[in-house]
Amino acid sequence: TGAWFVVDDVAEITEEKFRKHIHAMFKLTNGQLFVFSDIRRFGELRFIKQIADHKPLTLMAPEPFDEDACDYFLAQCKKQKYENKAIKEVIMDGQVISGCGNIYATESLFATKIRPTKKVKSISKAKKIELFKAIVDVLKESIENGGSTISDYRSVNGGAGSMQDRLKMYSRKVCPEC
């Protein structure tokens, strides 16, 4: 979570809420500031020499866009620790798929007509593959639209995304198709 800004002066961060929650600031060789702000305080900043030095990073699933990511996803779904869990909980786990949070999990499940509470073991392999492809499609669409600016999200350039205008199910209490 959080937002990164590259600015000449903190005053250039136009939204007060981001200026109030600055947790790290670095002066770059060109004189600009590299600023980390995290309103929700979920993010963390660690200095490590290599990924192997930080175990949580070694456990992360491959990027969904990687060639072997679907096979990895299917293998994770077969694991006993996941088979009795709700599919939404599983696809939001960074050890199963990287980068699929609540918004994009909701949209992907809606696109494939899978109930979020459905147990992983009760979903066919073909349907899991369809779901994985939907996750990739939703993530690509989100990237193309600058992400979802729902509360405090901003792009690396500080701008708002527009994916929130394209969401079909997220934040609705009732399914529009059921």
Predicted regions and their residues:
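Basic, nucleic-acid-binding surfaces and adjacent catalytic neighborhoods in DNA/RNA-processing proteins
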Residues: 13, 76-178
